[in-house]
Amino acid sequence: MFDKYETYNFFYDSRLAEYMIPTWPYDPILLIRKLSNGESALIKPAKGSLGSGVIKLNKIGNEYFAYLQTVYPDAVFSTTRELFFYINKVMVKNPYYIIQPFINFMKDEDSVFDMRFLVQKNGDGVWQITADLCRMSFDDFYVTNLAYEIIPVQDVLKQLDLDETIMTQMKDISIEAAMIIEEKAGPFGELCVDFGIEENGRLWIIEINGKPDKSLFKEISHEKTSSIAPYNTI
């Protein structure tokens, strides 16, 4: 599984840099600076945790607000000491964290969604998109790990009347991402690329997973999966 900060560094000098969410190693001083500047921040384990340990943070007036999975505050603090005591309790099981800006992603009604593309090598070693899906969050959740519905990406694009060229763009980016990571990290056979669309229409890569959970992809045919070459998976 890819380290999120390492993955970010794979792309910072590539054409895909504009799609990568800015990422920093966890630093309490940096976090407070961003919150004091009126930014909302997301802190999360550097390696995937299925949404566990992810905290959204912001500062309103003199108070700090912490959110776990939903848009409703889990806790409110009046001092940084209280805030960091709370954060440290969450981080105890996974001390290596990162900081990212919190991005307001587009919703379908009250459901945030992300779009996942499975990229695999065929028998000739050529990267191809073999499946896609869209995870719809429960209402008022800001994470999609506990999705209430999984639908094809094309369906959500139609529901929101989004330009269908976005589909082609995400496929092209996914294949290019696989090629870049292989160049940086060595041969492997498959990965997933997760995308989100910001409310202003900007496309972002949320995450790249080198050990995809293929059970989510109900639309992958037996013919496609049986043709995948036996490459190493990171």
Spans of model-derived segments:
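A long amphipathic alpha-helix within ATP-dependent nucleotide-binding catalytic cores
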Residues: 88-106, 122, 127-131, 136-196, ...
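Conserved ATP-binding module of the ATP-grasp superfamily
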Residues: 16-25, 42, 61-110
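Charge-rich, low-complexity intrinsically disordered segments
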Residues: 214-234
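Glycine-rich phosphate/pyrophosphate-binding beta-alpha loops
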Residues: 51, 135-141, 209-218
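Short beta-strand micro-motifs enriched in acidic
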Residues: 60, 118-122, 196-200
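A short beta-strand motif that forms the metal-chelation/ATP-contact edge
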Residues: 195-211
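Beta-strand scaffold of nucleotide-dependent catalytic cores
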Residues: 55, 67, 111-135, 205-208
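Conserved N-proximal alpha/beta basic substrate-recognition cap immediately N-terminal to
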Residues: 1-40, 45-59, 64-65
